[in-house]
């Protein structure tokens, strides 16, 4: 037998997303030059994707959209914060929280998003974690370019039907930066885990977690720092950031279909502080405490054989909360004055989605039509889900074994960020944020 070479294209069209969907394997994550095994950097090489030309940033711009227009999912659960030292209200950051060694597959959509994914205008990343080893314990110690970590893969029941896979990582950048006499000393920690239990041949229950604790301190031990370092020490605040997502999912398979139910809690706490002359004995010039969190629940059913049609439909809902306390010492020509602001609110949200698809002409032509509706109780402009209808149509025709003609037309909506909804305009007399704030929308045409 001669040599056999098996290869697969990363671009695999599906009925839901016949265009602009790329599957990323763990091997590609490991081998992408300069990515340092960071999934956020790997996708920057995809067609239509640009990165922010700033060192050590993971902000991704897709098809001309903003860095806050990307959405991330892990085993069907939304991940609002994907990166360390994340920008609140955006999706960028310093390095990805996700450990690629725990992933089974990644689907990256730059268009033609499936209807079950909400709030994405530019891209959606759908990640699936692998289950743990059902036979024996396996541990791995990893020394990376910027961190050290421990991976664990083990059964946690005697019959091997319940497993655990997880990791913990901690950076050593603060030691390296101190040796290099840089003015800031960042430290990040993250954890990730999945507990998976096979209840029966048709039923599966899983629990996932993803979180981080990041802090940035000023390097005040430098003697006679250079002018550029003095400048950075003069304006840069110290900060702490905590984020986490905990979620659970239930999968039930039946003849011709599947049911998935998920519930999750996510949270982000962002604190910044600055003292006059970096001396804690002197008054503060900046003190920000900003927090946001969500409870989410979603149920979706997929039916694969309805007289030749395929149907996917689901509903979801939840609550979200935001709190911000800000103090700034503002210096003007007339002197200094204190600027204080406080904002907090709670919203409810709800969603519905459905898609119907079918193949024609002996599976040469695939057609899909879908609809999604979202709403939240923030204001009259956002509460009616019929204002945020997101229809979509896609088709794909197989011309030959190697050629396929595909197209997609869709409209997508995204709710404003909490930082935008929470801005109270205390410096603008008569300002009312709720009067004009609404969902963002985009019409997308891809062929």
Language model features with spans:
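Hydrophobic, lipid-facing positions within transmembrane beta-strands of outer-membrane proteins
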Residues: 58, 121-123, 137, 143-150, ...
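Face-selective signature of the C-terminal outer-membrane beta-barrel domain
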Residues: 196-214, 236-382, 398
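Membrane-embedded beta-strand positions of outer-membrane beta-barrel proteins
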Residues: 6, 139-143, 164-168, 207-209, ...
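Predominantly transmembrane beta-strands of Gram-negative outer membrane beta-barrel pores used
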Residues: 105-116, 122-130, 137-183, 190-198, ...
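Outer-membrane beta-barrel translocator domains and adjoining extracellular loop/strand segments
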Residues: 176-182, 212, 218-226, 263, ...
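Transmembrane beta-strands of outer-membrane beta-barrel pores
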Residues: 112, 129-131, 143-147, 156, ...
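Surface-exposed extracellular loop regions of Gram-negative outer-membrane beta-barrel proteins
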Residues: 83, 89, 221-226, 269, ...
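Periplasmic N-terminal accessory/gating domains of Gram-negative outer-membrane beta-barrel systems
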Residues: 3, 7-113, 124-126, 130
